[in-house]
Design a protein with these regions (language model features):
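A short hydrophobic beta-strand segment most commonly corresponding to one strand
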Residues: 142-147, 174, 189-204
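A short beta-strand-loop-beta hairpin characteristic of the jelly-roll/cupin
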Residues: 148-169
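Short strand-connecting beta-turns/loops that link adjacent beta-strands
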Residues: 152, 188-189
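Conserved metal-binding segment of the jelly-roll/cupin
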Residues: 165-180
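Short, conserved beta-strand element in jelly-roll/cupin
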Residues: 123-125, 136-152
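Short beta-strand His + acidic residue motifs that chelate non-heme Fe in jelly-roll/DSBH
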Residues: 130-133, 175, 181-187
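Fe(II)/2-oxoglutarate oxygenase catalytic core
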Residues: 1-120, 124-134, 191, 205-254
Length: 254
């Protein structure tokens, strides 16, 4: 069977499943969720400056950070340059140990969030545009906490469906990424958010089914490959740091 036909059948099946799932969602089929309904969002907002401090330390070596498609290769359909950098703490439940060690306060905060599966710093360069796309599965909610927002905030925006939002430092937005969404940073400053995927709550029995499906996805080839790519980057980074450290020590002895 041709791959395109398999993809079409798979996509249609997912759409059918999602239409059933949303009937069991206490939040309905919305574009944006009300963050006030999730107490953990306030905890993040109240501690955003501590998160920002750890981010600033990470950004001191910005050029060494991996591009999104270097970690998650399927992202090449929406980005193929070096204008969207990432710093992963968690990816679909897989912990990036050395990165988490560099950001202990942020890690502790995200680990306290019920259903947290993915957490990373999403770093958009000035002028970066992410074309319209949709997420693969309705079983998670996408959350962004504004950490570095350009002064011309009106020119840095996200569209979900037919609604537009702007990020604010220290404030979060949460949306259903299975609705078509698009991002523009039409400014001369970078935009950074703490990017989270959270297991979406559903009434029984769909909640248990959803958690099972997410566990299966976490073992899929594309997630496994992304985990391998992340581990390779961490190893290269550690080796580079060790080499630089040794060079500095040697220079000090001269």
């Amino acid at each position: 069977m041709p791959k395109s036909l398999v993809d079409t059948i798979g996509f249609q099946l997912i759409q059918l499943i999602e239409r059933v799932m949303v009937r069991y969602s206490p939040h309905g089929d919305v574009l944006f969720f009300d963050t006030d309904e999730f107490p953990w969002t306030k905890t993040l907002e109240n501690n955003w400056e501590e998160i920002r401090n750890e981010l600033d330390a990470v950004l001191e070596n910005r050029s060494a950070l991996p591009n999104f498609q270097d970690i998650s290769e399927d992202q090449t359909s929406i980005t193929d340059d070096d204008q969207w950098k990432t710093f992963f703490l968690y990816g679909f439940g897989h912990k990036a140990e050395s990165n988490c060690a560099r950001c202990p306060k942020t890690t502790k905060l995200v680990e306290q969030i019920p259903g947290m599966k993915t957490a990373f710093f999403s770093i958009l360069a000035p002028g970066k545009h992410i074309p319209a796309h949709r997420g693969p599965y309705k079983g998670v909610m996408r959350y962004h906490l504004g950490l570095k927002v350009p002064q011309q905030a009106e020119n840095c925006r996200i569209r979900v469906g037919d609604e537009y939002r702007h990020w604010k430092e220290g404030k979060g937005i949460m949306f259903d990424d299975t609705h078509q969404h698009e991002v523009w940073n039409d400014t001369d400053e970078e935009r950074v958010v703490l990017f989270l995927d959270i297991v979406r709550p559903f009434d029984p029995p769909v909640g248990a089914i959803n958690r099972g499906l997410i566990k299966l996805i976490s073992m899929s080839p594309f997630v496994t490959k992304a985990k391998e790519n992340q581990e390779k980057w961490e190893k290269r980074h550690q080796q580079a740091q060790a080499t630089n450290g040794a060079a500095k020590v040697a220079a000090g002895k001269v």
